[in-house]
Amino acid sequence: MSRDSLGWGNVSTTLAPAEEEQAAGPVARHGWSGLARNADAERVRTELLAQDRMGVVITGDRGVGKTLVGRTALSGFGPEVYTIQLRSTGPGSATPYGCLAFTLARLPQSSLGSPTAILHGITSLIRDDAAGRQCVILLDNAGALDELSTGVLLNLLQTRTARLIATAQRTTDLPPDFYWLITSGQLAEVRLANLTELETLEVLQSALGHRVSTALASQLHQLVGGSPTLLQAVVSEQIERGNLVLSGSVWTLLDEVVLDGRTALEDIVRARYARETPEAREVIDVLSCARTLPLSRLARMYSPGVIADMEEAGQIVVDRTDRHLVTLGDRYLGDIVRNWMSVERRLELRDKVPGHQEHELDELTVEDLLAYAAWTHDCHAQLAPAHALAAASAAVRLFDPKFALKCAGSLSPSDAEWAEGQLQKSAAYLQLGLPLQAMSALDDVSDQQVNELAAEGFAEFIAAKADCMAWLEDRSGKVPELLRQARIRLQDLSLDDPPADPAALSRAGLCLDLCEFNYFSFIGDFEPMMERLTAAATTDVPGSDPVHRLRSAIILMEALSMTGRELDARKLMREIGGQLGEWSNVPRIRENFAWRSYNVLLLSGLWRQAIDMLKDASGRAGHGLHSGSAATDLAVGLAYVYAGRGYMALDPLLAAIAQLEVRASLQSLRQAYAATAFAYAQTGNSVQAAIYLDRARSADGPARFAVSSSTEFCMDMASRWLGDPEAKDRLIRAGEAHFRKGRYTLAGICVFGATVNGTVKDFLFLEELAGLRQGPLAEMSRTVAIGSRKKDAAIMLEAAEQAAGLELDAVQARCAALAFDFAKGAGLTASANAAYSMLESLSESVPALPIMPRNKGPLLTERERQIATLAGNGVSNKDIALEVGISVRTVEGHLYQVFTKLGVSSRSDLLGLI
């Protein structure tokens, strides 16, 4: 591995490249860059071989693979080209002939008398070695070339003895003579850029040999900044540590990426670190421990000149926000420097940083709190209780549950912050998908401690308890009674002497109301709360709580989408979206809005918009483990499945399963199995569909209603697709249950899935449900119900067009198949051909039709189709005969059959039907 390509400067004085080592991972070290750089190597070869070129200079930032591209370009020439690989000495070194030392050692004594003699001697030696072949020299680190070596190389180029491939970060780093050759066009420049996120994904998949989730690729891309060489080092280290594992057929991380430098990465970092001034090293040490610091605080510790120089060199990054937060330019650098630092050194640096006293807590941002807490834990020191609570709360806000547990774990029952700390611990456990542990954390708070809480603290504690109980089968039904008792307690507080603050009591009451709305939404029982929820979401009077109104509105829009009011739900969603900017400070409100909006859009048939909405959720998910990437992958896959595009759903679904199988996630795994079974069924892979269906059946457990209802639907649809005779009845029963609870949207979707082979009664029920709903999906359901009941091909073709408008491929195929059968039965040739053409256009995206036409054979034979296509394009009968190799009379006979079968009378009508 070229250390120069990764360093802040040139750290090796090696005169020839070392042997390539085998990486810890499945691909050789330089192979990683090669996977991304083959096209660049070809560009270098092309430029090098141009008639007017003396050579090529490869430029780019450290770590982009300049040396690798040069070596790959050389290796492509084969034995007919003589190649030499040279490397200049480090910067600041004036070693004469540094890169040519090995060649210099071979010269006879008579050729060492003067620079001119050396120049001629080296030129003759290289010509002799080339033995008449063309010669190409690869010069690594050309920016540090000494003057005498420059003269020799220029002579080799000018005399056409050799051509040159040189590497440098910038053309301005080159010796002046080489820079002049570039400006005159005699040396070409090939500029390398860092890998994009998509290229990182492609390299990982090629190198590791299996699926890699987009979330993992994104995480690694951000970590290494698109450097293929660093990417290999990080991946190899994570595989060696057992953190990056192959789960099923997908590579996934078991935990966050922590770099301890056990591979070549530490050598790279130590070499870079050793080159810095003592003051710059201390800045690196401080930022390694602190992770991030405001520029104002860093400037109180170090001179502005040092900070400015480090920013200019890219060693630190200062963001452009109001606080100007400073971080290291490369995150991996901080991880490794921190790892080798002693505890005493960490403590010494922590005491130097101002702004961490307890009375300054209110002045710290969320990021400051987390950074200070992490630094303290790195020092094996205890956080003060107030700091621990604040840091735990901040970690929960940023979805970093493991760190929240670490912070809250330092509190003891004797601390005044104990009850609130257990509240944060419970929230963290829920984020990890561990409701039993979350409930246990709250149970550890004594009744006396609960009673000592003020009104708002008490309400928040009860709300947290209700959130946990909803997940536990034996306690979920007790939530309404818990809330009733809590309201009685608040009423008692209002009668105390002195009474509690009325404003605080009002806020506590709203907290319990919101908790109740969330509970009913969790269990899918919308009717009992709709009136109160609507009032809470729409009441806008002086003195009302706008945040409570906004949170209630977010729950309401999902409730509306479930109960048949899809258009109202989407209207409310747009209104809320326009208000969110004012409330960006409210914890996790954007994520809550985005995920409930996803459900609104998905149930409205707008699956593309649902996927787009996830970008907001995943982009803001926080700093924690994978930032919810498994949930995002699952939701994307589910949207594709609902759209009937199983072939597109499999990659994100399998990536989600790989992540969910290695960690608990509130029963999302069961939903992932069910959706994957449905996706495989849609692609016609009945074996895999059955396997994942069995896994879904065995992965039982509590789940949010939106998840459990979707899971059951996917399982029943997969079963129906596989020919399970009982699947239809299960879907009908599910639809009836939803209907009785007022969930008309879900009822309509279930009955629609059941009526692929429905009865008149089923279609009447579907039509009734469509009348209770809003939006294009409801209208399409109504059209399908009427067309299926009347066996009307024209109506079914209309339904197919409606499905095409929503891009619901499987539904469109279903409508087209039925339209084909109805048209054939009624002798409507044109309609039958229109339906058949539609089915053919869907053959790739829907390989396994939800319903097969009774007449499976094509309307035209293969020869008839070939002739009809040529005729429709204006080819004469004579030319068709020559093209196909038959007589003109036979062509005329085939065309007669085509016109008869398709019901057309002119050639111009053929193209639209074939």
Please tell me what each predicted stretch does:
Residues 62, 203, 207, 211, ...:
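Short secondary-structure boundary elements
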Residues 95, 281, 321-325, 329, ...:
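Alpha-solenoid helical repeat architecture
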Residues 68, 121, 148, 152-216, ...:
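Alpha-helical sensor/transducer elements of the RecA-like P-loop NTPase core
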Residues 75-79, 157, 176, 181-183, ...:
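Internal alpha-solenoid helical repeat scaffolds
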